[in-house]
Design a protein with these regions (language model features):
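C-terminal hydrophobic helical "lid"/dimerization subdomain
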Residues: 4, 284-332
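Glycine-rich beta-strand-centered segment in the early N-terminal region that forms part
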Residues: 29-44, 56-96
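Residue-level marker of beta-strand positions
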Residues: 87-88, 107, 175, 244
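N-terminal Rossmann-like NAD(P) cofactor-binding module of classical short-chain dehydrogenase/reductase
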Residues: 90, 221-224, 246
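NAD(P)H dinucleotide-binding glycine-rich loop of Rossmann-like/cofactor-binding domains
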Residues: 92-156
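Glycine-rich phosphate-binding loop and adjacent beta-alpha segment
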Residues: 99, 230-296, 330
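Glycine-rich NAD(P) Rossmann-fold beta1-alpha1 loop
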Residues: 134-135, 160-167, 228
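Adenosine-nucleotide cofactor-binding segment
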Residues: 174-230, 288
Length: 332
């Protein structure tokens, strides 16, 4: 196997401040320093990847750059003792694909501390069917359960339910016995959400409270919010006493206007979900759960596979909110 050059998407910034993307040949020697060189077999597409690929300086500071915040593959060289040549591994989070050359290339070089061994019972492709979006969904459920939320306490709402994070959250919660309500702007995808385990599907406009009231009727024991903005504001008002809300996204807005009343009168909690710097012990636990108790083969039906060359169109679709389920990139 030739480990000297590889194919990758490279995003360049032109003199006119435009960003252009091409699949090019790169040298392995151009990769950043790191303990472990990995041949990437699969990657996956996330909203943050599309931001990086279109020149968002809040995600990626300098160009040229290879995006891809997820990668799964085989170790081809390692300077550490715990990770060996031939090991199958997953890398998500940290700086991968942001300012470190990412998974939209056939090779990555990263610190050993970023690497999680592929859990038993999970294939490399399956790991990227989850990727950062699926891991974030699982981490949200993990934190919700850790806060004491149980199926017997009532309905759990998932916002952005047809997206990469939301669809996995619906699937996991349903498997754990929760009564899941999925909120989406794509009511034509109601059947998909029902198949994933949602007991009820509502239009996102139902989470658009304009009453000005600090609290509404308590409906949900828990909420997994993936979109932020006004929907999160409304969701906070509708959580029952002792409930919990997790939040991990901002596609519906980064501002949050609320009052203290849901917190001091209903004792609710708001938990931020960060999958980037998640502690390694929690990261291992969550990936192990995804490979075992939380696995749901139904997700396979809502995963599309594509090549590097086909990614350009996907960037546009995900930024427009028109991509459903998960997209896996086959790098082999």
């Amino acid at each position: 196997m030739n480990h000297t050059s590889f194919r990758a998407i490279v995003v360049n910034e032109t003199e006119s401040k435009q960003f252009v993307r091409n699949v090019v040949e790169r040298e392995v020697s151009s990769l950043p320093e790191g303990d472990v060189l990995i041949q990437v077999h699969y990657s996956s597409l996330n909203y943050k990847d599309a931001l990086s690929a279109t020149g968002n300086k809040g995600v990626t500071r300098t160009y040229p750059h290879t995006p891809g915040i997820d990668a799964a593959g085989e170790v081809v060289s390692s300077e550490g003792e715990t990770i060996k040549v031939g090991d199958q591994v997953i890398v998500t989070g940290y700086d991968l694909g942001m300012n470190t050359s990412g998974g939209f290339g056939e090779y990555i070089r990263v610190p050993a501390s970023w690497i999680i061994p592929l859990p038993e019972g999970m294939s490399l492709k399956e790991s990227m069917m989850y990727g950062t979006a699926g891991f974030t969904a699982a981490l949200s459920v993990y934190k919700l359960i850790g806060a004491g939320i149980a199926p017997s306490m009532g309905d759990v709402l998932v916002t952005g339910a047809t997206g990469g994070v939301g669809s996995v959250a619906v699937s996991i919660l349903s498997k754990l016995g929760f009564n899941v309500v999925g909120a989406t702007g794509k009511m034509e995808e109601e059947e998909m959400l029902i198949r994933l385990g949602a007991k009820q599907v509502i239009h996102r406009t139902e989470l658009n409270d304009e009453s000005g009231r600090p609290m509404l009727k308590g409906i949900y024991a828990g909420v997994i919010d993936t979109v932020g903005g006004h929907m999160l504001e409304t969701a906070l008002k509708t959580v029952k006493y002792g409930g919990c809300v997790t939040t991990c996204g901002n596609v519906a807005g980064q501002e949050l206007q609320t009052t203290v009343y849901p917190f001091i009168l209903r004792g609710i909690s708001l938990l931020g979900i960060d999958s980037v710097q998640c502690p390694v012990d929690v990261r291992r636990d969550v990936w192990t759960l995804l490979a075992s108790e939380w696995e749901n083969k139904e997700l396979l039906s809502y995963t599309e596979e594509c090549t590097l060359e086909e990614l350009d169109e996907k960037f546009t679709l995900i930024l427009q909110g028109k991509l459903k389920g998960r997209t896996v990139i086959n790098m082999k």
